[in-house]
């Protein structure tokens, strides 16, 4: 775990909640997650849940993924997905819109592990450097990822070698993010 990355994640999450509360006078609201149990749920409100991020008591374990792909995941990947439960959060980075992907529940974490494993297997087959996605963009094939070799946060075009460095570290990336509520 990298403490700076964890602090930056928790700080961004709180900035997101604060921005939402200022804009909407409530905790963040999500209709898609209404029937899914999560420690993030603060209140059910009709067809939606009001939520806030929830730090994990114990970091999530990525041994299954690492064993399955025979690759040690970068510590920032483990911190990003292992430090808290949260709904996905919309944000901007240098004016570009994105959705920061998060883990809502333990079941969601199981699905994430399968997706990461599939992503890494595909990259290995295509002889690409390993990355792990952390955010979605409006462009269907462009994702924001952590390079597993360097820890750089990059914008990558899936299935290609097209990669642009956005930040040297996860902490730097998260510190530059602006909540979009």
From Swiss-Prot:
Keyword terms: Cell inner membrane, Cell membrane, Membrane
Lipid bilayer topology: Peripheral membrane protein
Coiled coil: none
InterPro entries with a match to the protein in the record: Syd (IPR009948), Syd_sf (IPR038228)
A family per Pfam: Syd
Main localization of the protein described in the UniProt heading: membrane
UniProt similarity note: Belongs to the Syd family.
Protein name: Protein Syd
Organism: Vibrio atlanticus (strain LGP32)
């Amino acid at each position: 775990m990298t403490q700076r990355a964890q602090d930056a994640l928790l700080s961004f999450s709180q900035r997101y909640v604060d921005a939402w509360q200022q804009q909407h006078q409530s905790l963040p609201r999500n209709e898609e997650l209404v029937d899914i149990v999560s420690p993030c749920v603060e209140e059910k409100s009709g067809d939606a849940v009001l939520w806030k991020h929830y730090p994990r008591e114990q970091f999530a374990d990525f041994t299954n993924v690492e064993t399955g792909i025979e690759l040690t995941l970068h510590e920032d990947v483990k911190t990003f997905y292992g430090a808290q439960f949260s709904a996905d959060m919309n944000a901007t980075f240098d004016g570009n819109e994105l959705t920061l992907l998060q883990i809502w529940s333990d079941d969601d974490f199981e699905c994430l592990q399968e997706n990461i494993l599939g992503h890494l297997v595909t990259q290995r087959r295509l002889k690409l450097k390993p990355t792990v996605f952390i955010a979605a963009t409006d462009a269907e094939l462009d994702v924001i990822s952590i390079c597993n070799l360097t820890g750089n946060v990059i914008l990558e075009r899936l299935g290609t070698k097209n990669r642009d460095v956005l930040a040297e570290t996860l902490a730097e990336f998260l510190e530059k993010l602006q909540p979009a509520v």
